[in-house]
């Protein structure tokens, strides 16, 4: 594997780890997650549609990072598990995708979407549910700060 891919995978794993551990306090859902043998993380990416290449490659990198963490023993002995969801490269679908991940799949964090428009549609849902969202590719300056206010549950690399 090329060096930059190793560095990118390690950086993504570190970012996911930091977000997961930051979001592990309080709440029944978080208590349930703390008692299981795995940490369930949602991945809402553009797997079909106009920008599917962005989503597919980012999901591939996330899987590599999670595999490395799991091979090293996981986080506090717990394995990471990804629940994938295709937002079809559409902001309205991104909202639906993230809603399902948060409310039905009960993930403790969401990685993705890849594009700024899909992230913008997703952050109100994750914020309302106090679930961290990591936007690994989105570039809009309003992803993490809007009107001078830092978004508490949104992280960008």
Label the model's feature ranges.
Residues 106-157:
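Extracytoplasmic ligand/sensor domains, especially the bilobed periplasmic-binding protein
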Residues 75-87, 150-153:
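Short beta-strand elements in bilobed, periplasmic/extracellular small-molecule ligand-binding domains
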Residues 1-40, 71:
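Short, low-complexity disordered leader/linker segments with a strong preference
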Residues 83-84, 88-108:
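Short, well-structured alpha-helical segments in soluble
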